[in-house]
């Protein structure tokens, strides 16, 4: 459950693996109003260059995230919302979305808990993050 919280996923999710992949930067975008992948801050308003299709996708995603039968936290700022009650900061990892038609190369696929244990071991952190 802790990993689900860290990644800002709905509590009822049933994920059991994680996939690592490579993609060109121009094949990715961030789920923010300005969707740039090269800066470190998200603007709160759409830039003039935002296309109608992107604005529609963004607004649809907001509706689904907040107002569906299974709402879940979406920051809209390019990082996940870590909804664990015991964390001092609710800022999770950065979010990137693969653009439709982008080429990706799968580097590895592993069980989620195997990955979690390895990360915990490498960072000398106790499970629970």
Regions found by a protein language model. Give the residues of each.
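Conserved NAD+-utilizing ADP-ribose enzyme module
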Residues: 4-129
């Amino acid at each position: 459950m802790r990993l689900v919280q860290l990644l800002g996923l709905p509590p009822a999710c049933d994920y059991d693996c994680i996939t690592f992949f490579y993609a060109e930067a121009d094949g990715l975008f961030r789920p923010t109003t300005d969707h740039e992948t090269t800066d470190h801050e998200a603007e709160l308003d759409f830039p003039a260059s935002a296309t109608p299709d992107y604005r529609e996708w963004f607004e649809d995603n907001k509706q689904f995230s907040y107002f569906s039968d299974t709402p879940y936290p979406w920051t809209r700022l390019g990082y996940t919302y870590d909804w664990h009650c015991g964390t001092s900061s609710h800022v999770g990892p950065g979010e990137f979305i693969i653009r439709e038609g982008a080429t990706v190369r799968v580097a590895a696929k592993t069980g989620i808990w195997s990955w979690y244990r390895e990360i915990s071991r490498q960072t000398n952190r106790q499970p629970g993050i």
